[in-house]
Regions:
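Thiol/selenol-based redox catalytic cores and closely related redox-interacting motifs
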Residues: 85-162
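Start-of-domain marker
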Residues: 22-53, 59-64
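Mid-chain, structured segments of secreted extracytoplasmic proteins
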Residues: 56-108
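Bacterial Sec-dependent N-terminal signal peptides
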Residues: 1-21
Length: 164
């Protein structure tokens, strides 16, 4: 009985920590391969980042994390800005397992609070893409396209997201 209990605890721990799979970052303001390299170095230096795969033509970066850490998306965006560039898009790939969402669209994932824009859902299931909304996760011209009412009041420790 002890072995079964320990096995179940291990399985639960593994599934809970593996929810955030990766981040896809699209940068803006790049003009050459050296620009891509500057962002690569800045993002790779973040303590919780495991690997960074670069697509120079699309100016995108697939970022994977150390399994025992919680990613901080604000630190990723700050690294890009500190390198002298802008974040055009930051999309988080998440594997949900019946994730509860409250009536205000709030849910917590790996200790990180999110607010879902648009129609509130009761739960999230399966693999989903969450686009981070707001400054510094998108370009100002794209942010202006979102009605202010949809942005609403969001706590400073909460990420505003939309399903992609």
């Amino acid at each position: 009985m002890k072995k079964i209990f320990l096995f179940l605890i291990c399985c639960w721990t593994i599934s809970a920590s593996a929810q955030v799979q990766k981040v896809n970052l699209q940068a803006s303001g790049l003009t050459c391969a050296m620009c891509s390299k500057a962002i690569y170095k800045a993002v790779s230096a973040i303590s919780f980042v495991d690997t960074v795969l670069v697509n120079i033509e699309a100016s995108t970066y697939d970022i994977r994390f150390d399994k025992e850490t919680t990613p901080r998306f604000d630190q990723i965006a700050k690294a890009v800005v500190d390198a002298g560039f802008s974040v055009a898009n930051l999309t988080v790939m998440v594997n949900f397992d019946k994730q509860a969402v409250d009536k205000n669209g709030l849910f917590t994932l790996d200790g990180i609070q999110f607010k879902l824009m648009g129609t509130p859902l009761a739960s999230l299931q399966g693999s989903k893409k969450l686009q981070l909304v707001g400054k510094p996760y998108m370009l100002p011209k794209d942010l202006k396209k979102i009605p202010a009412a949809q942005l609403g009041n969001v706590a400073s420790n909460t990420y505003l997201v939309s399903l992609k």
